Amino acid sequence: SFSIDGKRFLVLDCGENNILRNVRSDGGRARFRFDDDKELAARFEEVINNTDIVLNPTHTALGELGVMTRRMAWLSENGRYYFTTSNAIQEIVDHKAKKTKIKRNRLPLDSKILHYAFHNGEEIEPVCDPQENEKDNDPYRIEYYEVE
């Protein structure tokens, strides 16, 4: 974690959001995965309660969006912001092949699954239209959000 201009950031790299789990018996609500370890749960609670902005960059676009959306919402509760972005190249692994094959698909830059932003448990929209660049086969998209 780190701070910029008084805002406290927490970075979860890619699959580190699996520190949360979704409880089916509670409507799929996200919770800290290791809540049976009281000391670890208390440490996580202290970290998350002292975070203003959660950044969760991912290597590939998120799967299981219902599960992940609940986690994004949970991480943004109580005034926090949550931001994630992904590469535009999606890897699809074929486990049924004799040798593992990885197929790479390029997602359109306007694909919803490349960027998510949440605040107070709700998805938020960028403050302006995304800026896109697709020259030299190096695609990227930039979105801007207002953070209070």
Residue positions per predicted region:
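Beta-strand-turn-beta hairpins that frame and shape the catalytic cleft
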Residues: 1-18
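Generic detection of short hydrophobic beta-strand segments and adjacent strand-loop junctions
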Residues: 2, 143-148
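CN hydrolase (nitrilase-like) catalytic-core segments centered on the catalytic cysteine
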Residues: 17-142
